Amino acid sequence: QDLPGNDNSTATLCLGHHAVPNGTLVKTITDDQIEVTNATELVQSSSTGKICNNPHRILDGRDCTLIDALLGDPHCDVFQDETWDLFVERSNAFSNCYPYDVPDYASLRSLVASSGTLEFITEGFTWTGVTQNGGSNACKRGPASGFFSRLNWLTKSGSTYPVLNVTMPNNDNFDKLYIWGVHHPSTNQEQTNLYVQASGGVTVSTRRSQQTIIPNIGSRPWVRGQSGRISIYWTVVKPGDVLVINSNGNLIAPRGYFKMRTGKSSIMRSDAPIDTCISECITPNGSIPNDKPFQNVNKITYGACPKYVKQNTLKLATGMRNVPEKQTRGLFGAIAGFIENGWEGMIDGWYGFRHQNSEGTGQAADLKSTQAAIDQINGKLNRVIEKTNEKFHQIEKEFSEVEGRIQDLEKYVEDTKIDLWSYNADVLVALENQHTIDLTDSEMNKLFEKTRRQLRENAEDMGNGCFKIYHKCDNACIESIRNGTYDHDIYRDEALNNRFQIKGVELKSGYKDWILWISFAISCFLLCVVLLGFIMWACQRGNIRCNICI
């Protein structure tokens, strides 16, 4: 007798999801490595090797440092009144004027860099009884001796150097930055030759601050033919405040002020070339795209940049769990459900159906469940980027040798922040990956349950993601199941009749085996009963005695 399941009276419908031959390994909360059909790299690990000049205004310092440009070193005159978003200092920058030091170099550099301008306003300071515009052979401006263009070196006039007392109010509505200095001669003779007094002094004050500097006379290592030094200082005068300068010698006076601006301009040391291109994020290595949430190119950044992490790679799952398709399927060929494996041949959707009926075999994607999964996954990358991208810049920190402990503490804090963000990135990506896999599995289960509810008693769950349909189901019938218009009442009587026939035949085909097992069990039971009866009878007759000792 032929089985009803082998003729045209039944059909097989399987549900499955797509798969690829070689997936991508990602990390989730529960698994360090799980294969998915598709994933996106989240860590930017390389730069363009060049700094883009758009949309940020880049000012190439070339052979000048920012402080040299600020002071007006002769070879930096081209930077007068310049503006920038990012000032790029080069490793080959050098000073070419009178040797100087800035006791609070890092703070001054940072202050000017963030202001984003070298706009300078000359003011009418009155220096009575002294000679102005001093110069040095160490600071050539053309063939003649020169000096920093933003500073005024005051020396004796004749044989006198009177006490200077000058005030300059700030009647404007913005902060003013004044740069001034103190000259440290190399010998006592140089001191008296320039300033008459054996020891001079400078005091600069406002209502909020006061600085008093006494020259330190003594020989230092020769630089550009000079063993003396100039110490550069700075004072910020707020609106409504007054700048007061008192000196009896050694004063390097300001010629005016720099107009301070508030903004997010910055400075960066880099030897990367500047090119015409567009990039929001800049590192010392060059510009990098900011379409990823993380980067490990450089800790120092400017602009809207990915967050720096230690990891070289973090992959965000943008596809479902990948279960490559098995190559052999026995009698049913490739028709098997999602419980066993995915389907590599399905390219027009993530979820779908395969069927086998009287008209042959076929496959179709389920676009509704596919779109539901894609809608939930789309935007994941953008959401991660929004959570992590810096909207500000991270500048390099500089400290003098005296502030070594502060530098160590700052480094520790920065390293701790990087460790924390690296850990957070790991957890964030693992959580997102877990969510992606769970939701794609959920969509598969939803589709399977939806199909089960349609078929009801007309089909049987085969346990592998497939249904055995107990009625004739042509391609139109299969299509009605896929699109949700299937009416199980129409096929119920036929399905019940075929189910009973198939189950009955299956019972008859296994009848002999059941009889053998039942007969064996009864025989064993009867043998045990006879043996137990014989022992009891023998004990009563005295033929067998049983002693129990305690």
From Swiss-Prot:
Its job: Binds to sialic acid-containing receptors on the cell surface, bringing about the attachment of the virus particle to the cell. This attachment induces virion internalization either through clathrin-dependent endocytosis or through clathrin- and caveolin-independent pathway. Plays a major role in the determination of host range restriction and virulence. Class I viral fusion protein. Responsible for penetration of the virus into the cell cytoplasm by mediating the fusion of the membrane of the endocytosed virus particle with the endosomal membrane.
Source organism, top-level taxon: Viruses
Membrane topology reported for the UniProt record: Single-pass type I membrane protein
Gene: HA
GO cellular component: host cell plasma membrane; membrane; viral envelope; virion membrane
The protein's name in its UniProt record: Hemagglutinin
Extracellular side: 1-514
Species in which this protein is naturally found: Influenza A virus (strain A/Duck/Hokkaido/33/1980 H3N8)
Keyword Mitochondrion included in the entry's annotation: no
Site residues by UniProt (Cleavage): R329, G330
GO molecular function: host cell surface receptor binding
Pfam short name (any one): Hemagglutinin
GO terms for biological process, alphabetical: clathrin-dependent endocytosis of virus by host cell; fusion of virus membrane with host endosome membrane; fusion of virus membrane with host plasma membrane; virion attachment to host cell
S-palmitoyl cysteine-type lipidated residues: C539, C546, C549
Transmembrane segments: 515-535
